[in-house]
């Protein structure tokens, strides 16, 4: 047990041993990180004994991590591209491979001055914010159903891109482009209500909504990009989750018996919301390339291709509304 007056290295050894016994991967790294969270110090640069408050904080963190709570939840943040996202219980932690999806999505917008972008099943908002980071002029709306996840989405929409050398645009106010020669855009009742209420400035606009019905609110042909990392695990895969993943929200992971229910809805209902030539960019599971590309082809999508992640696995499918 971590106790008052313990020296830093002894405390970290104690935590590492307990995490190792609990089966935590990277127990040495986690122990050092938990020490930093509890004390605000780097164990390599500190020799002051722990105070009672620090020891108690480290003991709580160790107990939670030993129960296989994700380290990112304990830290309260997760790096994505070159910015930090708020995370915690109730929202899916962004994965490094999803950065590939954000980059692929942004690349579809090359040459478009002020693209309109919709991020569905947004979670933390990592994809929508990633697109905004690559394309500062993009007008991005992020849609998330879960009330728990929406708390993090709203916070990230306000805070994640500040200090990144980009202008954080208040998308609730008419932009210079909207005032000039770009036609007024109708995002549907949800976002229009937010605009009317004059909410705080956001880099991207958070909206609470359901992928399975949100398409009904969208006008035809006014988006340049729809991006999504929907749930895609099968029922069988949900039974075999790693302990840390099992503590993330099932709502963000499970997609029916075959893992394709969200892709069916996207393929069937969202094409007309895009302008001709507009892009759909989807994260997929590493074994889903054939199934997802077939769904898109069956529903009249064009220019379908697959992009691999850093590990060489199929990770992203892109398609376009025919011109």
Short names for language-model regions:
Residues 48, 60-155, 186-187, 318:
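SAM-dependent Rossmann-like transferase core, predominantly class I methyltransferases
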